[in-house]
Amino acid sequence: MSRRVDLVADLGEGYGDWAMGDDAALLEVVTSANIACGFHAGDPRIMDRTVAECVRRGVGIGAHPGFPDLVGFGRRAMDLTETEVRTDVVYQLGALSAFAAYHGARVAHVAPHGRLGNLVATRPDYARAVVDAVSHIDPGLRILAQDGELADAARAAGVVVGIVGIADRAYEDDGTLVPRSQPGAVIHDAGEIAERTVRMVTEGVIDSRNGVAIPVAVDTVLLHGDTPAAVELARRIRAELESAGVVIAAPTALDVEARR
């Protein structure tokens, strides 16, 4: 199983004067960031500041495109056409790429947010749209995904995939996430989350909510910055992974090219 993982958090998910989570503290722990691109959260000032901080701290920059749903934080399903999904992703990735270029950096990966992130695992049309956008803008980008339609479509197009394990979410028996609308979808016990994460990385297994052992091969662990005690949890997960002999590091460009 993976002995090296990229520790990623969703950042820049505020709007105007409103901020969600302690991004500065999380940036001391994580190795990469999924940065909101203005549709579900984020705005030009927040994107600019977040990219600048990632560059200053050596944290990998990732685009976190979502549905155009500020009110619902991108967590509500939207029935869009394939073209609409593609153009929305192109728009958001283009915006973040411009901020990265301004600060002398580049976007390294793309990780769909929220309900879009769930649907691309099961809807081939949405998966194709994301891969089409990414492969035309920069085929050297990684796509972060769970096993499913998006991962399959990316591999078929020659785009490198980072398989994501989500530390604080419950899984169904088929390996998909339990919808947030259902009880128990989000796990809050820090000890349980840390234990599940270490097992996921070192043994390649995560237990579903029904106790089914699901095989996984993650090289990326996602932490949500909008949960209570997110910073303390991130520190604990990193410490326990390192105690288990896991190297915490973002992939380099050479790493990505070697997997192509």
Residue ranges and their predicted role:
Residues D10, H64, V110, L223:
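Conserved, mostly hydrophobic/aromatic
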Residues A19, D23, A33-H40, V71-R86, ...:
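Glycine-rich tight-turn/loop motif centered on a GG-T
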Residues A24-E28, R49-G62, A101-G104:
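Acidic (Asp/Glu)-rich catalytic clusters
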Residues V29-S32, V55, H136, G140, ...:
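Glycine-enriched alpha-helix->loop->beta-strand junction motifs that scaffold or abut catalytic
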Residues D69-P112:
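Glycine/small-residue-rich loop that forms an oxyanion/phosphate-binding "nest" at active or ligand-binding sites
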Residues R123-A129:
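Charged helix-capping and loop-helix junction motifs
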Residues G148-V205:
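Active-site rim beta-loop-alpha module in soluble metabolic enzymes
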Residues R180-R260:
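C-terminal alpha-helical cap/extension of soluble enzyme domains
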